[in-house]
Structure formats: structure tokens, C-alpha cells
């Protein structure tokens, strides 16, 4: 689905106020569900999540955490629900054998970096991670899922939108009332403009939570290849506008944009229309890494990957927290 604009307007607009009673019921049900005790995992669980629906930068953050854990000598594996995929799991993702329709787009992307297990049953998925040789699990999303006990949870925020109008779905973007979500959070990561992120950093500090700052940095080689090139950009992610702005920032000549819903399954007709327009106008098609795995392998399309870049002090703090976690829990 595509997030409605009124989610991000504060104070809440008329559509949000009309939906607020439904949001209150949804939020109360979510809060009750989140209060259930989780099953223990066979090794430490690091959860990367967010308090809102939509894109915040969780996948680049999960990849960065796995890289840090490897530097610390750990053997991380990713655990994902496999949103958008048809296979319930638990199964290990093989990018050469599985498609996004089977396991979801995010698992295909992160499986290039570390063993990745897709499982709707999170405790069963955690057992599969351990069987695959992992001694620490990076749970991609799942902050609100109570089925598996987490040892450390990082809540990722987009500084540009924050918590929107502060209301639960469908009146706003919150997955549950904030009061029910804060106790689940071990640390906060705010991605984007530092000035816009100050209220979030202050809210974390008021709760005694470590608050990290980061940005999504485009891959240097891909950025150089796109600089000065006329492009037709398309994306089916939580906030396509962020991707389009990244292209402008690296110097691509943005001649057209096409936004699709998050996790969009591209149809043959849509792909053909994009290719025809790009050919007719002499443009290069460009999309995100996450969209690329949902497209035919033979399709000619450029990609602008991004990675999480942290302020040096925050990178050191994150490394120290992960090292302490590994020292403090070596088993179930």
C-alpha cells in the first residue's frame, strides 16, 4: 500500500481525526498482542524495527549491524518474516533459486550478505538460524512481534517524517501506540537531516535510550556512473521520494519519476511501459536495490545502492553495545 499524505500531517487533519476511533481500537489490540511473552532463542537476537509503517532504512541498518557483528568475530544470520513472499518457511533463502514472489524482496537482498532464514514462525526461524551456524540473529523487522524474545532492539526513524501525526493505523502511521512501543526499544537510530531529527533524539534521551544519528550514503561507483546521465527513475518502496532525491543529490538528470506501492510486484505490462518510455526518450532506467530483485534478471536497469553511514562517535557506541551483548549472552 502507499501511505496516505494525511499520515504525515501534524496536527492530525480531518481524515485522520475521522479514523482516530478505528486507530484507537487497532492500537489497543496491537498493544495487547505485544505484551505477550516471547519464546527464548538459541542465541542472542538483535532486532531492527521501526514504530511506523513504511520505509525508514531498516534494511541498510540490518546489513550494517551484520557487518559490525562479523567484525566482532560473530557469525550472524538474518531472520525475516519474508513479507510479500508465498513460502511460510522456515527455509534458507537462496538468491539463485528463490524469487521475490516466494520469499519477499528484502530477504533476497540481505541473503547476499549473510545466511538468511525466512519464517513466519519466528521461534522456528531462530532455531533454523542456529542450525545454519549462526551464533547471533539479526531480526529484520519484528519489533512488534511478540513470539520471539529479543536481547536488543534498535528502532529506526526517518528524520524527515518522524512519527507523522502520532496516531495508530489507519488514522496514522504508528504500528501501535507509542507508549506501548517505547518499552520494547533498546536504542534509537535517526536517519536523515540532523535538524529534523532533533525531536526524535530528544525523545530517546528523555527515556534514557542511546540515540544514534546516521544517513543513507549512495554507493560511490554507482553514483559516479549516474552523474550527468538523463534517467527515468522508478521505485516501489516506502518513500520513493527519498530515492528520487538521492538521484538528484548524486547529479543524475531526473527526467521522469514513477512511484509504485511498497513491495510492488511489477507486472509485465508495467515493465514494458517503462522500457518503451525510456527507449523513446533516450533515458536510462534506474531503480533501488530492493526493486531490482523484483524485476526480470535480463532487464536493462541501473541501480543506486545505499549503505548506512554513522557519525564516528555513534559507530563506536553501536560497536560497543553489540560487543557487550555478545559477551553477556553466549547461549540460550
From Swiss-Prot:
GO molecular function, one term: ATP binding
Pathway: Glycolipid biosynthesis; lipid IV(A) biosynthesis; lipid IV(A) from (3R)-3-hydroxytetradecanoyl-[acyl-carrier-protein] and UDP-N-acetyl-alpha-D-glucosamine: step 6/6
EC code(s) of this entry: 2.7.1.130
TM regions (residue ranges): none
Coiled-coil zones: none
Alphabetically ordered keywords of this record: ATP-binding, Kinase, Lipid A biosynthesis, Lipid biosynthesis, Lipid metabolism, Nucleotide-binding, Transferase
Highest taxon, organism lineage: Bacteria
GO biological process, one term: lipid A biosynthetic process
Record's catalysed reaction(s): a lipid A disaccharide + ATP = a lipid IVA + ADP + H(+)
Physiological role: Transfers the gamma-phosphate of ATP to the 4'-position of a tetraacyldisaccharide 1-phosphate intermediate (termed DS-1-P) to form tetraacyldisaccharide 1,4'-bis-phosphate (lipid IVA).
Family: Belongs to the LpxK family.
Name this polypeptide is given: Tetraacyldisaccharide 4'-kinase
Lineage: Bacteria, Pseudomonadati, Pseudomonadota, Alphaproteobacteria, Hyphomicrobiales
Gene: lpxK
